[in-house]
């Protein structure tokens, strides 16, 4: 099999169908090989190989906008576009991104779901205004159709009549099991040939029948369409082709050529198998969606077993315990049941915990109503995805001052997924909201205490915790959580103080321990609360320590530094504040330890900076 992956449209057109199939097989082999070493989105990419090849053959990637929703299906596109030589660096520091990025030659950035059709609509408008003959092509998975933004875009696209192709990759899975009426609707797809030939027969019959018979025939056609997969799209004004076999290159190429010739908005419904070509992944739901390094033969993870439980596992276990204790606890996740650990609760309490698919806005507002009715909702969500429901957080939770708990997973640097997934903004966008209380645990025991407190707390409350395990290796005595109270972990006469928040406490402790080995010292405070701050403790601290270092995994702007400076100004206190929070730029992908070193946020870099102020 050929190992040359980069192909122009002209080169692909010269290949026979058999050669294209061989190319697809080689692509799969390469993707499996690289992802097994680097980790990545495996099953979704394996399921979209033929779709991507056909896109590149029928359309011109140099001029036609190729838009990959979420870009979990973009690896084949990267290989076809000339990234073969650097594909081995996928998701590595300073290497190829696992998502689409304009800086790598892609049309648009993607990492969050359900944006592709809106982008296609905008591209259509721009192309029309410029008088150009280009056709946007959007590849979107069936899971993304659970988000409302898709229908906002389809509604306008169908009315616009711009040339545009929506390639719907229907693997009936999304990340976890499919959720909602739309998924069930697509799964009822009928055979393309039968549906298309039926439409043609009806059209011919309507031309020759008298008026009364024509009316009856139209009613019959409308009734038939109620059980066909194209109804949804056709009623929105889009042409519909399918369902087709998404692994049959001949079928896909033919459908794309047909859609291109229509010169109207067209949806091609392609049915695929997630994980196609790797037997261990075929037909699996969440397990092979996003993976770490693994052994190809056995499918077993090659990651060293970490004896420490992940923060997600701790959250899941604590919530199970709380839910068994308090029957008014309910919860929701937006298409991430296994990622957030809510799958265990959905399994045990299916009438109290729900996965609402990719619908963060709906998730938040629906839980607001449950809080209004006297329940205690826990919303389990990645920090980066809470951004998608910001208006609902303000309008439906904060203003109403409802008893809603936001459990923000993947806070801080998340590593290989890069800019679109780093959880470094939540403190900045939640802290300004009246009625909100913000906390972060430093370790497992404090996570337990904070969750107990969150249940009893009145008003909206959010706590953040990291991807992976808590890294604090010192067992400080846990404290009872009291509203707005911090904990003084290391107390001495040093003029230097370390203020840690969440995972930042562990970093502060590591730097402090290194200082102590040099016969130096510093005070160590676990803020516990970012809002409200413990003003009493901080006023006492300001009397003795005049240099404060902030350890927090959030951006500086709107982060702990901003909150501390507001406090100091309020009481006219004169303290020098040095923040080790993140600068005003997006953080790229790579292993967390390597990213931190690049940002000079590793322990050695932090220690060097602290020593400049130590006398």
UniProtKB/Swiss-Prot annotation:
The protein's enzyme class: transferase
Pfam families to which the protein is assigned, alphabetical: DXP_synthase_N, Transket_pyr, Transketolase_C
InterPro entries for the chain: Dxylulose-5-P_synthase (IPR005477), THDP-binding (IPR029061), Transketo_C/PFOR_II (IPR009014), Transketolase-like_Pyr-bd (IPR005475), Transketolase_BS (IPR020826), Transketolase_C (IPR033248), Transketolase_CS (IPR049557)
Statement: the UniProt record of this protein carries the keyword Nucleotidyltransferase: no
GO biological process annotation, one example: 1-deoxy-D-xylulose 5-phosphate biosynthetic process
Catalytic activity: D-glyceraldehyde 3-phosphate + pyruvate + H(+) = 1-deoxy-D-xylulose 5-phosphate + CO2
Single GO MF descriptor: 1-deoxy-D-xylulose-5-phosphate synthase activity
Binding-site list for Mg(2+): 142, 171
Pathway(s) of this molecule: Metabolic intermediate biosynthesis; 1-deoxy-D-xylulose 5-phosphate biosynthesis; 1-deoxy-D-xylulose 5-phosphate from D-glyceraldehyde 3-phosphate and pyruvate: step 1/1
Repressor recorded as keyword: no
Subunit annotation: Homodimer.
Entry protein name: 1-deoxy-D-xylulose-5-phosphate synthase
Organism: Campylobacter jejuni subsp. doylei (strain ATCC BAA-1458 / RM4099 / 269.97)
């Amino acid at each position: 099999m050929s190992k040359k992956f980069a192909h122009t449209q002209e080169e692909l057109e010269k290949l026979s169908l058999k050669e294209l199939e061989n190319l697809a097989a080689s692509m799969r082999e390469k993707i499996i090989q690289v992802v097994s070493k680097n980790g990545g989105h495996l099953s979704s990419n394996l399921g979209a190989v033929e779709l991507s090849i056909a896109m590149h053959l029928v359309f011109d990637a140099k001029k036609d906008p190729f838009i990959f929703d979420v870009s979990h299906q973009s690896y084949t596109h990267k290989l076809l576009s000339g990234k073969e030589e650097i594909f081995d660096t996928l998701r590595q520091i300073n290497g190829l991104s696992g998502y689409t990025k304009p800086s790598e030659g892609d049309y648009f950035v993607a990492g969050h779901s359900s944006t592709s059709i809106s982008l296609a609509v905008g591209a259509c408008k721009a192309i029309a205004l410029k008088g150009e003959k280009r056709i946007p092509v959007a590849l979107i998975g069936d899971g993304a159709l659970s988000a409302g933004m898709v229908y906002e875009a389809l509604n306008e696209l169908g009315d616009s009549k711009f040339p545009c192709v929506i390639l719907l990759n229907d693997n009936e899975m999304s990340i976890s099991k499919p959720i909602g009426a739309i998924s069930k609707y697509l799964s009822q797809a009928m055979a393309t040939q039968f549906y298309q030939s039926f439409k043609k027969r009806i059209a011919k019959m309507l031309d020759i029948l008298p008026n009364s018979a024509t009316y009856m025939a139209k009613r019959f056609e409308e009734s038939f369409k109620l059980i066909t997969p194209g109804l949804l799209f056709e009623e929105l004004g889009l042409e519909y082709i399918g369902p087709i076999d998404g692994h049959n290159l001949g079928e896909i190429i033919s459908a794309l050529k047909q859609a291109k010739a229509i010169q109207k908005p067209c949806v091609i419904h392609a049915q695929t198998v997630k994980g196609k070509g790797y037997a261990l992944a075929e037909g699996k739901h969440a397990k092979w969606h996003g993976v770490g390094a693994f052994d190809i033969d056995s499918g077993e993870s090659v990651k060293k077993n970490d004896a420490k439980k992940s923060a997600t596992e701790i959250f899941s276990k604590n919530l199970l315990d709380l839910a068994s204790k308090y029957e008014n606890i309910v919860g929701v996740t937006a298409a991430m049941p296994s990622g957030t650990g809510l799958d265990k609760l959905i399994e045990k309490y299916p009438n109290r915990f729900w996965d609402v698919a990719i619908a963060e806005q709906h998730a938040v507002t629906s839980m607001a109503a449950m809080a209004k009715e006297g329940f205690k909702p826990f919303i389990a969500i990645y920090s980066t995805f809470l951004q998608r429901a910001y208006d609902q957080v303000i309008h439906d939770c904060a203003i109403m001052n409802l008893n809603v708990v936001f459990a923000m997973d993947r806070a801080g640097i998340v590593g290989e997924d890069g800019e679109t997934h780093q959880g470094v903004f939540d403190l900045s966008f939640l802290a300004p909201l009246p009625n909100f209380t913000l906390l972060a645990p430093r370790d497992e025991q404090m996570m337990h205490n904070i969750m107990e407190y969150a249940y009893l707390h009145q008003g909206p409350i959010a706590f953040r915790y990291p991807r992976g395990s808590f890294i604090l290796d010192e067992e400080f005595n846990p404290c009872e959580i009291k509203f707005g109270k911090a904990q003084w972990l290391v107390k001495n006469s040093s003029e230097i103080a370390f203020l840690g928040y969440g995972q930042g406490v562990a970093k502060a402790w590591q730097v402090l321990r290194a200082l102590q080995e040099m016969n130096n010292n510093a005070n160590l405070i676990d803020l516990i609360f970012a809002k409200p701050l413990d003003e009493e403790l901080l006023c006492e601290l300001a009397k003795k320590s005049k240099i404060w270092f902030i350890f927090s995994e959030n951006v500086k702007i709107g982060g702990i530094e901003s909150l501390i400076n507001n406090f100091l100004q309020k009481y006219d206190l004169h303290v020098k504040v040095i923040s080790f929070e993140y600068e005003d730029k997006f953080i790229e992908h790579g292993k967390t330890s390597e990213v931190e070193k690049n940002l000079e946020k590793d322990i050695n870099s932090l220690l060097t900076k602290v020593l400049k102020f130590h006398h």
